Amino acid sequence: CLVGSEMCIRDRIITDSEAPYHERKVTLLNGPHTVLSPVSYLSGVDIVRDACNHPVIGKYIHKVQFDELMQTLNLPMDELQAYGESVLERFNNPFVDHQVTSIMLNSFPKYQTRDLPGVKTYLERKGELPKGLVLGLAAIITYYKGGTRADGAPIQPKDDQKIMDLLTELWATGDTRKVAEGVLAADELIWKEHGDLNKIPGLTDLVVEYLDSIQSKGMLATVESIL
């Protein structure tokens, strides 16, 4: 098939610009991985495949993938949906026990490159924040608090030592607003060219809301509240 400047050969696409397809991969493959991992782990789910098949976490992954991230890309929707389905098939691979903890190394830099652009674009296009992606950020922040899960499993974040020190200092305040504001203000350390994320309308308040909910109700109940 010929589509504009593209030529499709079965599952291959020859195009004069690889940028949209690289963005598609980063957004729809890497992006969901980054947020599903802390959400799943803090909900007691350790394997990516099990997360996809979980009655609550599976819906969360689908929401982030199809309702949020996919809406920020500029390729044909039918093509994006087909790619999204192929990603879910990959996540569901019965022969690979992909531990979510293996994905969570350096979660903040990953969120900055894979998910934050989607948060900003979604807000621009829809006039509201993508709840699933923001909850994913709150889950990362909570994961970096450390400690143990409800089942006693250890929570052992790994990242740049300066980021680890910042989160330790912020969580020591016991104030979720200070935690959220401090993380979102860490432009030089985490967010780079995106600047101080407290300037994004509504983001600080929503992160605080989710942090409070995770602390009081637990991760799984918080996920259910946005579905």
Task: Please report, for each region that a protein language model flagged, where it lies by residue.
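Short, solvent-exposed coil/turn linker segments
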Residues: 17, 47-51, 64, 210, ...
